[in-house]
């Protein structure tokens, strides 16, 4: 993005008018008078009449073709758009409302409020194309974001101001975990969250809005949606719209913000569609040649500045569970922590279905999390890894053929697996079990005691989907009373 575009964020230049010369699906070519072509990323408006209803279509400039022509991508269906229609240059990029006015409301990628039309248009607005923070503004200190979810805090701790990827195929719990994190941040830290729904189901967006309203966390959250049924231009820009709202809370109000993107794969997918429509040569597996660049433009803006941060939790759909696919592989490069949700663990009824052996965090090292945390985490991972290696022997010969030491390892691993599951606040109405927030110190102590064998006499059922050790003791007492 050029400096000129950065300067246009809040003030429009004198507008020029052009004419539509070609419409191919969501791609619209517009001719302007000589010397009056709009800048790249400028928003253009064109009025259309469809079935006696007037509406304004927003176009975004994507290419300068020469001969006074610009190629644009439509942010709405192009039904009713005809050659010769007048197009007006707004003189600035797509802009969205920012500030407290966006909390508790649902917006689209263009900044239009969906639940209260017209809201925020008379207040401050920021353009969605912005530069990342300068190097000297970045925060150098690394801090853990305590979530109260045992498996995350112990084995894949999140970085405050970092980027976290939730990887998994369809139906393993990515969206549920994001909803849970929104609830925890609002309840435990009174923090502000921004949710960007990128290319997901409209029904899920509606359900999320109603559930957040029911749980009392909606007033601390801004929601921006560009759903499955919308043109690729919208799905490609909605993440930037949500990020812009989050940047205002960080830079102007000095808040720590959580940005949720569901699903970052759909952002890549929309970019691929637009790239093809613009006539670019595809690269590996049919993705756009600018995949790494587009991902970098988004991810580099998500960071900590002096004393405040944007922490991003991004659901990443993995096509056919193939982690070598260019879309998830490109996302990996930007992440500070990865939480992989595993279908095999979900099939055991353990939620969140986090795979502790494949999930990672760059801050799980003694210098950042401390010696005790690191040692306990490594002991847990070693026990689970040893159990995995023994599964083939168990499947062929049975448990009886194992050494006594290996039998103990397998039994402890099974207890650890179940104890890594946890009751969620958002699942209360389905399970009837209240959600739990487990402090990090309690989590470390609990797993250390399990690894030491203090609970070897407890049945595995006593560890299912619970919070801390107090819940385990209560479950054990209940089982023995029977």
Swiss-Prot record:
EC annotation from Swiss-Prot or TrEMBL: 7.1.2.2
Q: Which residues form a coiled coil?
A: none
Topological category with respect to the lipid bilayer? Peripheral membrane protein
Keyword annotations: ATP synthesis, ATP-binding, Cell membrane, CF(1), Hydrogen ion transport, Ion transport, Membrane, Nucleotide-binding, Translocase, Transport
Q: Which domain of life is it from?
A: Bacteria
Short name of one Pfam family: ATP-synt_ab
Query: Can you tell me which residues bind ATP?
Result: 168-175
- Its protein name is ATP synthase subunit beta
Originating organism? Corynebacterium urealyticum (strain ATCC 43042 / DSM 7109)
Q: Name the encoding gene, please.
A: atpD
